[in-house]
Amino acid sequence: MPKYVVISNHPPNSCPSANAVLRKRGEKLDTDMPPLMQKHSIKPEVMVHLDPGHKVLWVLEAPNAEAVRDMIYESGLSQWNDFEFYMASTLDWINEKIREQPTIW
């Protein structure tokens, strides 16, 4: 199954540590996210906070990019976070693709 890397971030004033409304919403995510990921057939491999910033790194296994996008929207996380979204490949795969391409210099 394809892997996707997502980096989410928010400004300090949108941090659940500082904002009472977002703290309540953030606490709900502990119970809301697992069924939402299951609904979209997403398996989280890594979800870590990048200290001391306001960023989270996600490595997800998902059937397609749309499943990840839809999960983000349905969770409500996009209302207070920005997201960078990447397809992920193994180094073996990318090295094979590199060998298939002619050099340009």
Residue ranges and their predicted role:
Residues 78-90:
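Conserved short beta-strand edge segments in small beta-sheet-based binding/regulatory domains
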Residues 1-55, 63-71, 89-105:
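Short S/T/G/P-rich N-terminal loop/turn motif that feeds into the first structured element of a domain
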